[in-house]
A protein has these predicted regions:
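Extended, subdomain-level signal for the structured scaffold at the beginning of enzyme domains
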Residues: 2-92, 96, 104-207
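Aromatic-residue-lined binding/catalytic grooves and analogous aromatic/hydrophobic interfacial grooves
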Residues: 100
Length: 207
């Protein structure tokens, strides 16, 4: 995203300091991309003083991306301020994206017509099988895969667990897991932005 010249801001439900998941600081998650962030004082400073969701103006962003991790299941699922922001961003033709469990923050989002944003959309994210393999199925608050299907989403469940993949459809981009955040999700978001720019240039409405 930086290479394409996109500016990035980081917000959080309550604002302020955002702690990092200790497990994510270890192998295999501590890859070169993660190290570059941890070694950058400028980037780490973004996590120390984040604005709260309620202060974000949806009209000033071309895309919003929800970070993953199991904490998203607790922090995002029933956050009405986040859901209102996502709906506003999506309905004005901007991109909504997620990585891993970040898609839990999208599942309960309703659009102005009362429908669920994910209804009829292709999406992906951690499966229930993967939660069982990770021995956390008894610790998480719900089955996100099942909830996605209940909301009418066309959920993609890969045969091989933990593979890196992404799905993009009509302004919604979802990455299967945190390993999908780099080239896959970021590239898909850029492609969606290019597609929307092309439609706007032709005078067409985004789908």
């Amino acid at each position: 995203m930086n290479g394409r010249g996109f500016e990035q801001d980081i917000a959080s439900p309550r604002g302020g300091d955002v702690p990092l998941d200790p497990r994510s600081l270890k192998f295999p998650f501590r890859n070169e991309s993660a190290k570059s962030w941890l070694d950058s004082q400028e980037r780490m400073a973004l996590l120390k003083n984040t604005p709260p969701i309620r202060s974000i103006d949806p009209n000033t962003y071309d895309a919003i991306c929800l970070a993953g991790g199991h904490g998203a299941m607790f922090d995002f699922t029933h956050n009405s301020e986040l859901h209102n922001l996502i709906a506003s961003v999506y309905e004005r033709g901007a991109i909504v994206a997620s990585v891993g469990h970040g898609y839990c923050g999208i599942l309960n989002v309703r659009l102005s017509d009362g429908s669920y944003l994910v209804n009829g959309k292709i999406l992906t994210g951690p499966s229930w099988r993967e939660e069982k393999l990770a021995l956390v199925s008894q610790k998480v608050p719900y089955n996100a895969e099942e909830l996605a299907k209940e909301r009418g989403a066309d959920y993609i469940r890969w045969k091989r667990p933990y593979r890196s993949s992404a799905a993009a459809t009509n302004g919604l981009v979802t990455g299967h897991n945190n390993s999908s955040s780099g080239d896959l999700v970021a590239s898909s978001v850029c492609e969606e932005l290019d597609r929307l720019d092309s439609l706007k240039a032709k005078g067409s409405e985004p789908l």
